[in-house]
Amino acid sequence: MSPQTETKASVGFKAGVKDYKLTYYTPDYETKDTDILAAFRVTPQXXVPPEEAG
């Protein structure tokens, strides 16, 4: 049997849904030479609003 480890849920991540505009978009952000641009296409399931799928 493997040894058990204790996990602390409150460290590093707080569960919950936050509005996209409040957490990811920063209008005054200045790009750096080391920044990487990645794009993904998301297709929402039926009855899911497109802004919620992404």
Swiss-Prot record:
* Entry EC no(s): 4.1.1.39
Q: Which residues carry this modification: N6,N6,N6-trimethyllysine?
A: K14
Q: Where does the record say this protein resides?
A: Plastid, Chloroplast
Residues excised as propeptide: 1-2
Enzyme class label: lyase
Asked if the keyword Membrane belongs to this entry, the reply reads no
Pfam families, A to Z: RuBisCO_large_N
The GO terms this record gives for MF are: monooxygenase activity; ribulose-bisphosphate carboxylase activity
Q: Which family does it belong to?
A: Belongs to the RuBisCO large chain family. Type I subfamily.
Query: What is the name of this protein?
Result: Ribulose bisphosphate carboxylase large chain
- Write down the species: Colletia hystrix (Crucifixion thorn)
Q: What lineage, starting at the top, does this entry show?
A: Eukaryota, Viridiplantae, Streptophyta, Embryophyta, Tracheophyta
